[in-house]
């Protein structure tokens, strides 16, 4: 029965009320943009269910602090993870570029948005690929703007659409 503890445990409620309890003990989770917002909620939920969670974010905090648009930062982040674990079970690409539109976004800012939203997720997965556990999962977070843009959010839309 102990081997079942490593498997997700589902508790089903009545009618439409389905409560799902998942256990992630001994799982390693990587979250980009996990210092606040959706990324923080994702990281907190995995931690609450027993996972070892590695967060990278530009915002200062109790996590790896760095700008994922920089290749050497991603390499250092992965080196830190791999020095402690030889496998990764989940990669959550959640970091978001700035949200600027065509009227105010410079060429350099647009390139930065693409680096955060496209290049960084690609390179992070490439670096971690040799360490992905059997059954590992990669989740790329996006928004509805990848299907229906709004004015003055073009940089965000372009970066989010590419990794969907």
What are these model-predicted stretches?
Residues 10-28:
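Flexible N-terminal pre-Rossmann segment of NAD(P)-dependent oxidoreductases
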Residues 22-53:
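Canonical Rossmann dinucleotide-binding motif of NAD(H)/NADP(H)-dependent dehydrogenases/reductases
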Residues 58-72:
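Rossmann-fold cofactor-recognition segment
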Residues 94-99:
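Conserved NAD(P)H cofactor-binding loop of Rossmann-fold oxidoreductase domains
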Residues 101-111:
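Substrate-binding pocket helix/loop in short-chain dehydrogenase/reductase
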Residues 125-126:
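A short, exposed helix-loop element centered on a Lys and neighboring polar residues
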Residues 139-162:
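Catalytic loop of short-chain dehydrogenase/reductase
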């Amino acid at each position: 029965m102990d081997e079942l503890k490593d498997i997700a445990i589902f508790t089903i409620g009545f009618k439409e009320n389905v409560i799902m309890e998942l256990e992630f003990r001994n799982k390693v989770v990587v979250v980009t943009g996990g210092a606040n917002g959706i990324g923080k909620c994702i990281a907190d939920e995995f931690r609450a269910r027993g996972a070892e969670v590695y967060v990278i974010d530009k915002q200062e905090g109790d996590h790896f602090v760095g700008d994922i648009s920089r290749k050497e930062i991603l390499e250092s982040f992965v080196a830190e993870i791999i020095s402690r674990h030889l496998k990764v079970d989940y990669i959550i690409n959640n970091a978001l570029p700035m949200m600027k539109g065509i009227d105010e976004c410079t060429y350099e800012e647009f390139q930065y948005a693409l680096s955060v939203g496209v290049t960084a997720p690609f390179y992070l997965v490439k670096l971690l690929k040799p360490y992905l556990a059997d059954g590992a999962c990669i989740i790329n977070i996006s928004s509805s703007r990848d299907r229906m843009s709004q004015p003055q959010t073009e940089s965000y839309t372009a970066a989010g659409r590419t990794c969907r």
